């Protein structure tokens, strides 16, 4: 069962952690972020289908879906002005979930090595991924971790990590590349869970 959904930096959602139960109803005023949460969940599900980069492109690119408010809301509250600012930190969109058995985190950003004249300088890419066991992500529960093109899996000895790949393309997820039930069942389980999520934009409540 899913316990938690976390979203940081997506549209009107600066940083939320949403606890889930058997049935969770999200309510709020217009503009409070309900639609943003729904769309972020669809993006997260696309990670399991290997389609998250294409989905971001169809939304207008990563910069079109990022949180546009101030990086430091506390300072904005003190001044009484809440408005967008020039970014001083790396572009980042983070999403993830935690459940009884496995959890997953993905961090999407922009290339830092492509020059400004590159045609791919604004293309979104996967910066970081983590697959962990149980409802809480920590070093001791991490099974697979990816930083840019480098992927590691927890060593069978229980100490440290073993290299899985040092050349994973930035547009590919570990879930699309290595989720083989025989070799990496934990990746296959997370991938299949995301693939099995279903989304309905509307449904009858009187039937």
Predicted regions and their residues:
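Conserved P-loop NTP-binding catalytic core
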Residues: 39-113
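Hydrophobic anchor at the beta1->P-loop junction of P-loop NTPases
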Residues: 26
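Phosphate-binding P-loop
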Residues: 15-21
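The conserved Walker
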Residues: 30
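Conserved lysine of the Walker
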Residues: 34
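N-terminal pre-Walker A segment at the start of P-loop NTPase domains
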Residues: 1-14
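Electropositive, glycine-dotted interaction segments
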Residues: 92-207
């Amino acid at each position: 069962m899913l316990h938690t959904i976390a979203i940081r930096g997506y549209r009107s959602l600066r940083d939320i952690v949403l606890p889930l139960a058997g049935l969770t109803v999200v309510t709020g005023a217009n503009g409070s972020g309900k639609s943003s949460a729904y769309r972020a969940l669809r993006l997260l599900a696309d990670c399991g289908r290997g389609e998250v980069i294409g989905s971001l492109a169809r939304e207008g690119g990563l910069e079109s879906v990022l949180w546009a408010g101030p990086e430091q809301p506390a300072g904005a509250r003190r001044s009484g002005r809440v408005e967008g600012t020039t970014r001083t930190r790396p572009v980042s969109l983070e999403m993830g979930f935690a459940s009884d058995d496995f959890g997953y985190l993905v961090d999407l950003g922009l290339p830092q090595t492509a020059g400004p004249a590159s045609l791919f300088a604004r293309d979104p890419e996967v910066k970081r991924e983590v697959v962990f066991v149980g409802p809480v992500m920590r070093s001791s529960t991490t099974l697979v971790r990816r930083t840019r093109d480098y992927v590691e899996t927890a060593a069978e000895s229980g100490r440290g990590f073993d290299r899985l790949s040092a050349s994973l393309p930035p547009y590919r997820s570990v879930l699309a590349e290595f989720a083989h039930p025989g070799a990496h069942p934990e990746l296959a389980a997370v991938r299949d869970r995301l693939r099995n999520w279903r989304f309905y934009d509307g449904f009858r409540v009187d039937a």
